[in-house]
Amino acid sequence: MSRVREAFGVEVPLRRLFEGPTVAELARAVETALAAGAPAPDGPIPRAPRTLRAPADTALPLSFAQERLWFLDRLEPGQTLYNLPLVLRLEGELDAAALAAAFGEIARRHEALRTVFAERDGEPVQVVLPAGPWELPAADLSGLPAAAREREADRLAAAEAARPFDLSRGPLLRAVLLRLAPGRHELLLTFHHIVSDGWSMGVLVREMGALYAAALDGRPSPLPELPVQYADFALWQRRWLTGKVLERHTAYWRERLRGLPAETELPADRSRPAVASHRGAEHRFALDAGQVSALEGLARREGTTPFMVLAAATLALLSRLSGRDDLSLGTP
């Protein structure tokens, strides 16, 4: 919908995409908005080219999402709720120096990965650190017996994922290389959510493959320079979402969330603690091919996504267990 707003200069609510999920229906929604003279809140969204960025010595604001995470970190320092761990298994001969060079280039390309969060006059600001060589610590577990090796690899991965970040000092991306055997490695990556998300992790993995191959061959980066950085977006967002524009969006969500219960009471076998311990657990299960096919078929018939079908099923279950029909569901 942001591309629609950028191309046509009109605001089309996101719900229109789900009410009419075809190109023809979306085109009619755009035509209706144009005929009604419904401009975007600030006209078409401008791209934020590098030339519009504040000088490096100017305080860069946080995006609203970043500020929320910064506030939560200040409220409960040392929590690891927003650590994003990722374990990559690498098969075949590995050049650790080339891998470190690839990481260095990724950090150079993506300023968010070398950003820390300072406080100036009581307000958080982004500070982009200079690019430099990337040090890739490594641990060689290949001398351990197979069972002990796997246990130690799991222990190191869990310990790395549970290690807190210092948002004011960084780095907010950590990488550790484990050598399990000749031609077998694990790469432990841990991000803080303030500089990354699930989508960004996929981008990093794809770019790492391209940059590692280039480093092995002694070639420069094959990837084009990025036209914008996350700080560009944060600066644009802060300039746009202010005054009446911010008031309108805030009023909308206050109305949508008005009366929403603060928590969902479930028939648990023990009482809820006064202070959240965050000592939760996860239950993993798999859907067989038939179930996946049925899920995707239902989503197609309803003009929605498999995620929304699963979210609806989860809410239906929570409604049955809690006896409530007004529920909230948080997702990453």
Residue ranges and their predicted role:
Residues 12, 97, 199-203, 304-308, ...:
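Short, solvent-exposed positions on alpha-helices
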Residues 103-119, 265-267, 298-332:
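Hydrophobic "lid/gating" helix adjacent to the active-site nucleophile
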Residues 11-24, 57-62, 91, 192, ...:
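Glycine-rich loop motifs involved in handling phospho/adenylate chemistry
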Residues 1-48, 123-127, 131, 206, ...:
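Phosphopantetheine-dependent thiolation modules in NRPS/PKS and related acyl-activating systems
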Residues 279-292:
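DNA breakage-rejoining catalytic core of tyrosine-based enzymes
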Residues 295:
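Aromatic/hydrophobic pocket-lining residues that form π-stacking "cages" and hydrophobic walls in ligand
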Residues 3, 55-137, 144-240, 244, ...:
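Acyl-group handoff/entry surfaces in thioester-processing enzymes
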